[in-house]
Swiss-Prot record:
Disulfide bonds join 94-186. This is Extracellular superoxide dismutase [Cu-Zn]. Its cofactor is Cu cation; Zn(2+). It comes from Dirofilaria immitis (Canine heartworm). GO terms for molecular function: copper ion binding; superoxide dismutase activity. Its main location: secreted. It catalyses: 2 superoxide + 2 H(+) = H2O2 + O2. Destroys radicals which are normally produced within the cells and which are toxic to biological systems. May act in the parasite defense by neutralizing superoxide generated by activated leukocytes, thus acting as both an antioxidant and an anti-inflammatory factor. Keywords: Antioxidant, Copper, Disulfide bond, Metal-binding, Oxidoreductase, Secreted, Signal, Zinc.
Amino acid sequence: MMGSFIFLLSIIISINYINSLHTVHRSNIHRNMHNGGMPKKAVAVLKSDTVNGIIYFQQNNRASATTIYGTINGLTPGLHGFHIHQYGIKANGCTSAAAHYNPFEKTHGRPTNNIKHIGDLRNIKAGADGVANVNIISNHIQLSGPLSVIGRSLVVHANPDDLGKGNGDAREESLKTGNAGSRIVCSIIGIAPST
C-alpha cells in the first residue's frame, strides 16, 4: 500500500515539474514577444513528387519590408502563380489551404496595386532547367501581429497569374485567383531560426 502511494506521488511530482517547465518556456516566449521580440525569419519547405524547394521570409522589424527568397526546382519552364493561402495544409494537400490570404476581402490584383489580396505575391519564373530563383521584397507581408503569414501556406501554381487583368469569360476567376491554375506544390510557413 505504501509503495503504491509513493509511486503515485512520484508521478504527480513529475507531471507538476514538466508542467512548470512548459509554463516557464511559454512565459519566456510571450515576454520576448511583448518586449518587441518577433520572429525575424520564416521558412516554407516545398516538396512534391517532382517539385522541391526552400523559400525563406525575412523581416527585421515590424516596420520593415519582408524579403522572400529561395530556390524552387522541378518546375515547367515559364511563369507560375505564387501566393500565400489562408490556411496551413492538412492531409489532403494543397486544396486544404483554401483561397488566397485576403483578410480585407479585396479582389485579386498585382502586388503593387492598392486593391489586392495580402497573399498576392507575383509570378515566379522557372528557366529552361526548371529552376526558379525567388527574390521578392514585400511591404505587405508580416511575420508577426494580426496579419502574420506564419501558419498559413505558400502555394506554387501550374500557370501564370494574370494579376487580376483577365477579360471576358476569364474575368470573374481572374479577380479571385488570377487564373493561375492548379496547385502543384505547397508548404506551411513556419518560424525559422534567425541565423
